[in-house]
Amino acid sequence: MMQELKILNEKRAEIYWWLSSLFFKELSEQDIARYHSAEVRTFLSGLADEQSLSREVKHLVEALNRLQDRQDAQLELAADFCDLFLKSDRDSALPYASVYTDQGLLNGKPAQQMRELLSAHGVKVEQNLNEPEDHLAIQLDFLAHLAISANQIEHSAQLSLALQAQSDFISQHLLTWLPAFAERCTQFDAFGLYSAAARLALAFIQQDKHCLDELIQETH
């Protein structure tokens, strides 16, 4: 079981790092070209094999297909990113937990909690990401770190605690605000790529928590 779990954790970390990259910064021309490659389309097809993710993967693929016909695709998609995630007006979907859970304030209690968690686990945020620590990209990256770090554990009791920590992080730091974030993305993202990504992130996180909770029961 341990070897199977290590493979699963590597796959989970890969998906979390990928999701983090979508909300980290605007996609470049090279990034967009990669999304049209057979390698990435195979990766997305693999995700779609999971029934709970298939609908949201389909919406993301449809948006990527529309992107191929979009005039000035990179510039327009960068504008979508800016309008959704970098503006502070009412027609945006700011990717910070504090906005949704701390009276709409930036850099609130969730950011402080994330700073403490990152410090406790020795995780450093990329220097060029000048954002509060409760940014979605940072939270997803941290979850990937937790998943891959669990592979260093050999004892089942410690492993169960590590899996529980991941489940608790999802409950306490992501599911408290991600549904509202995904809803706002859907409301304000006319083209639909980032709203599809947000809904897919939510669906994957919900499914991952369910999977973690089952694994915790098995390791007891």
UniProtKB/Swiss-Prot annotation:
GO terms for cellular component: cytoplasm
> Per the UniProt entry, what is one GO biological process?
protein folding
Instruction: Say if the entry is tagged with keyword Ribonucleoprotein.
Output: no
Which Gene3D superfamilies does this chain map to? 1.20.120.1820, HscB, C-terminal domain
Q: What InterPro entries does this protein map onto?
A: Chaperone_TorD, DMSO/NO3_reduct_chaperone, HscB_C_sf, TorD-like_sf, TorD/DmsD_chaperones
Q: Keywords, A to Z?
A: Chaperone, Cytoplasm
Where is this chain's protein located in or outside the cell? Cytoplasm
Q: Which family does it belong to?
A: Belongs to the TorD/DmsD family. TorD subfamily.
What job does the chain carry out? Involved in the biogenesis of TorA. Acts on TorA before the insertion of the molybdenum cofactor and, as a result, probably favors a conformation of the apoenzyme that is competent for acquiring the cofactor.
Q: What is this protein called?
A: Chaperone protein TorD
Say which species the protein is native to. Vibrio cholerae serotype O1 (strain ATCC 39541 / Classical Ogawa 395 / O395)
Which gene name belongs to this protein? Answer: torD
